[in-house]
From Swiss-Prot:
Name of this chain's protein: D-aminoacyl-tRNA deacylase
PANTHER family xref list: D-AMINOACYL-TRNA DEACYLASE
Bias kind Basic and acidic residues: ranges: 22-37
Assembly with partners or alone: Monomer.
Obligatory cofactor(s): Zn(2+)
Species of provenance: Halorubrum lacusprofundi (strain ATCC 49239 / DSM 5036 / JCM 8891 / ACAM 34)
Length: 493
């Protein structure tokens, strides 16, 4: 069950709450066990959600989760006892966003990296709901009225002591937007789209990403640095397979103080995001050193994008055996049965280079289609160096890659043949030397002959075939027997 928190002290929150009740098939109930001001009295239930109203602003509520899960003494429904004391999966605070940011729909998690002027405790971070934040941002983007931007914000304000994960879903940024019915309804729709969502990131198959990776950390990243509206971390949320937990913007890090002296707060950012990796915006060597001393890893946005949904143990193995992602490692479409079931070898350098010259995009597709991973150069744009194949009987391998690269060459050559030890490509092409011997002047006439047109020189017609020569190009490859004999890579220590 997802707990929706509406504040009567926030007109935008009430407005969103009205649309939530209008959009859903809610059952009205009564909880006499707690004051109306604290979420008691009338509350609402529908499949997957419970909605309660509180008098205080959200940021000053200590732990509203305690109010949810059905009310003791609720006699409005015979089935009420079935969900009494049900713990919410997470809290969704529907709220206004205030600022000079115009039409904006946002989501963020809460906490204070330093002082607590707007609720919660100082130096304390709440339990984040990165998976829910990712899903609600996706839903906000789908439902946002024309003209509204969508993104995430950094971690800020209270509450900090919620007993379950939480997030804010906000409508901003001033009175015209808070009273905008279309925008409030968009936020309500986005919140209802959270039905069935876990606080942590889950796959399309409903598995948490830590279950897939056999790792205690889901695909969550902690963010440090940058501005309040966190454009880099919004990109990660919206454009990658990863979710973002706590984000300490530059202003929050300024309030935090020296990283090494505040290791406990930095560790909270990881523990309460269920994350083990961080992306740091800008040069912050002291912060990076502290993060690594705490046993976590600093990665780049490129790393997050490149890894995508690949199994993390496989990524670790490939970064050890080939290269790191920041050094140029990129991934193909093949996923082996286990991290140890890979075979690392050199790419067919000359063949690959020529195929890239014929059609760079097709050559890249050929490598990606057959490989588990491969090294690159030129900022990851050009495959080069080593390649890892799956070591099994059914996955594509070196010979399949050679065949696909040879297929790319067919677009630029008359014939292409794969032999034992080489790919042989033949072409009949314009020969400037032969043309010069026939008296053809350099310039436009050369270009016409090279394009397949005849030219006339001193009254003589010279056809392209008259000044063409057959060329044979040999691109070395490993023979099939060499390919079959290549041993699998030994497991890393």
């Amino acid at each position: 069950m997802i707990a929706i928190v509406v504040s009567r002290a926030d007109s935008a929150s009430e407005h969103i709450g009205e649309h939530l009740l209008d959009l859903g098939d809610w059952e009205r109930r009564d909880d006499p066990s707690r004051p109306d001001a604290d979420g008691g009295g009338t509350y609402y239930r529908t499949d997957g959600f419970e909605l309660r109203e509180f008098d205080d602003l959200h940021i000053y509520l200590d732990d509203p989760a305690a109010a949810f899960g059905g009310g003791a003494g609720d006699e409005t429904n015979d089935a009420a006892s079935d969900d009494t004391d049900e713990t919410p999966e997470f809290l969704a605070f529907v709220s206004r966003h205030s600022g000079e940011t115009g039409e904006l729909l946002t989501a963020h998690v809460t906490g204070n990296f330093g002082p607590a002027p707007y609720g919660g405790e100082p130096d304390t971070l709440a339990r984040a709901a990165p998976g829910a934040e990712k899903r609600v941002v996706e839903a906000l983007a789908a439902h946002a009225p024309e003209g509204y931007d969508v993104g995430i914000e950094c971690t800020h304000h209270g509450p900090t002591d919620t007993s379950v994960p939480s997030l804010f879903v906000e409508l901003g940024s001033d009175e015209p937007q808070w009273t905008d019915a279309d925008a409030a309804r968009a936020v309500a729709r986005a919140v209802l789209d959270l039905r069935g969502t876990d606080a942590d990131l889950v796959t399309d198959a409903g598995e948490t990403t830590d279950e897939i990776d056999d790792d205690p950390h889901p695909r969550h990243v902690v963010g440090f640095g940058g501005g309040h509206y966190a454009p880099r971390f919004t990109r990660i949320v919206r454009e990658t397979e990863w979710a973002v937990g706590h984000v300490g913007a530059d202003w929050a890090l300024g309030e935090l103080g020296a990283p090494d002296a505040n290791r406990d707060v930095i560790e909270q950012a990881f523990a309460r995001s269920k994350a083990n990796v961080a992306v740091i915006e800008g040069e912050k060597p002291d912060l990076e050193a502290t993060v690594e001393a705490l046993g976590h890893r600093v990665v780049s946005e490129t790393w997050v994008r490149a890894v995508g949904d690949r199994p993390l143990p496989l990524v670790e193995r490939l970064e050890s055996d080939l290269a790191t992602i920041d050094e140029g490692l990129r991934f193909g479409e093949v996923v082996p049965a286990s991290p140890d079931a890979i075979r690392v070898r050199g790419l067919p350098e000359d063949l690959l280079s020529r195929a890239q010259g014929v059609d760079a995009d097709a050559a890249r597709v050929a490598v990606e289609t057959n490989a588990v991973a491969f090294d690159t150069e030129q900022a990851g744009t050009r495959a080069a160096g080593s390649v890892a194949f799956a070591d099994d009987e059914v996955s594509p391998g070196y010979d399949d890659l050679v065949a696909d690269l040879a297929g790319v060459l067919e677009r630029g050559y008359d014939t292409v043949d794969i032999t034992d030890g080489a790919v042989i490509a033949r072409e009949t092409a314009f020969d400037p030397e032969l043309a010069a011997k026939r008296g053809v002047p350099e310039g436009p006439a050369f270009g016409r002959l090279a394009s397949g047109e005849s030219v006339e020189v001193d009254g003589e017609t010279i056809a392209p075939a008259d000044v063409s020569r057959e060329r044979t190009n040999r691109f070395p490859i490993d023979s099939p027997t060499d390919s079959a004999a290549e041993p699998p890579t030994e497991p890393s220590e």
